[in-house]
């Protein structure tokens, strides 16, 4: 899958030659991005490269990179834990470039990835979890047709204030995706 939107953003599969540029994203993670995704603020470059390259060959995942119009990596969209027998998988997305937040880029990437999951992989169910203190992501997932199906209460800590937050479980079924399109 290679998709380009009207603004020139591209969503495409991760390639081995992307590993170093991808690793640079994790040299110093924006505190707000780390807060909303549960990430650390810093990762070892070699470990990120190894992880990235291993994921490319992993048959239970499909990793996509989100590039801005200058071809700079600004995020990723991942279908993981693909279970071919159950036709189910887990989904996650992260926009690392905070200047790209709130512009609809994430919603577009979610839509493209969800379409790929059902159309190309042939999934029956795609699930995700999102922190209760990430309302922008919750709205984007609901806009894409995901339905809330459960809550893990006080399962995470909001690094902004030290308070507990909920981990919201969401999913979309193939029939819901077809109706939503």
Locations of the language-model features?
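A short, well-structured alpha-helix characteristic of acyl/acetyltransferase catalytic modules
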Residues: 1-49, 175-181
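Active-site acidic-Proline motif in GNAT/NAT acetyltransferases
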Residues: 97-99, 103, 132-133
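Conserved acetyl-CoA pyrophosphate-binding loop and the N-cap/start of the following alpha-helix
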Residues: 100, 104-113
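Conserved GNAT acetyl-CoA-binding A-motif
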Residues: 119-129
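Conserved catalytic-core motifs of GNAT/GCN5-like acyltransferases
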Residues: 127-130, 147-163
